[in-house]
Amino acid sequence: DRYHPQILYFDWWIQQEAAKPYLKKAAAYYYNRAAEWNEEVAIDYKFDAYMFGTAVPDIERGQMADIKPYFWQTDTAIALNSWCYTENNDFRPAGDIICDLVDIVSKNGALLLNVGPKADGTISDEDTAVLTAIGDWMQVNGEAIYDTHVWRTFGEGPTKVQDGGFSDGVKKNFTGEDFRFTAKDDTLFAIALKVNDNGEYHIRSLRMQEHTAGTVYHGLVESVSVLGTDDAPVWTRDENGLHIKTNYTSDKPITFKIKLN
């Protein structure tokens, strides 16, 4: 009541029978109070503690392998070995976290990222560096993340993501053929999870084929641009895919903004 939390996060054990009556009371009170506050809120849970559809299912340190028709969440930490500040933490590279974020959002999920402060409340230089790098990327590519929704398919490419929790320590060796898709209005965002040195990209989900051949998209591609640069890429489209050539490069994922019609 004092702080009006936007998220009420539960960890494990609450799926036990002894906790069930209290979960219902907590949810009813929280949701009713949120309605009085006129705020959108969420309850995060694990292990089927809540009935499906009444709260947000959470996967700890892991992801979904495929797109889901319902909203879900991943919770993980900047460090692989700890949730709190620890000397000599094994910090995850910002690029790896960004790839996970993009993959999660493309599958109808959200990322809850933990940062462990020191005892005096300050954030370590290592944490700050990772957060700053993520923020810099979001400044350029946030349009493909915020206020978007899933497309017809979450993406394409050879690299598979392990389904389930406690797998974020498994290195995902994404390639320049791995794309994740998000959408908004008449725009498709195709995010390449790794930059190709030659600047050439081929999005096979946008190939031109007959409806009998399992085509993902039958409409028109009006334009293609790259977030972060004013230089227009060269692009063509045929029965093998949408082919893009750009001089823009980065050490993190890049986003193609594709206008559809």
What is each residue range found by the language model?
Residues 1-261:
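Mature catalytic domains of secreted/periplasmic carbohydrate-active enzymes
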